[in-house]
Amino acid sequence: MNHIKSLHIEGFKKFVSLDVEFNEHMNILVGENEVGKSTILDAIKTVLNQQYRNADKSILRDLLNKQMVAAFEANPSVKTLPRILIEVELALDPKSKNADYFYGEVYGALKKQDEKFGIRFECRYDEALGAGMEQSILEGKIPYEYYNLTWMTFANNPYQMMR
């Protein structure tokens, strides 16, 4: 049965880094208020439904992890700019339609150079687009308008939500 196998989050809302493994049949998120249950669901929606695809870049203030923003402010540089990475690993039948579109080597956060099915969302500063912003960055300003939001499959294909 096709399902979400695992989730990796870096720099999204309250999570600096989080890995979640899912059960094939049923998953229940249980916890106190404000521990991140809804954030896990938002991360999945962000990847699969391309949530925020056409949103104003000012929304990034609410999406970037506050600890990562504080670390940037303490040591402002292009290398310390906060970013978001969310990877959803899928368990797909290799013979199913479009399975090859999602199958490829994983080089991202999972750091296992395995071949898996999945989709990766990345939100990061685009140095080429933001050429000339270095001084502003060194002053501790995050250039949200020069961030790119990209959705790619593990096969390095652009991901478009299937309707």
Protein language model regions, located:
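Generic marker of residues within folded, mature protein domains
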Residues: 10-12, 19, 76-80, 110-111, ...
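Electropositive, glycine-dotted interaction segments
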Residues: 85, 92-163
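Short amphipathic alpha-helical surface micro-motifs
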Residues: 1-4, 9-11, 23-24, 28, ...
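Short C-terminal domain-edge/linker segments immediately following a structured domain
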Residues: 38-40, 72, 119-124
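Conserved P-loop NTP-binding catalytic core
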Residues: 43-113
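Pre-Walker A-like glycine/lysine-rich segment at the N-terminus of P-loop NTPase domains
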Residues: 1-50, 58-69
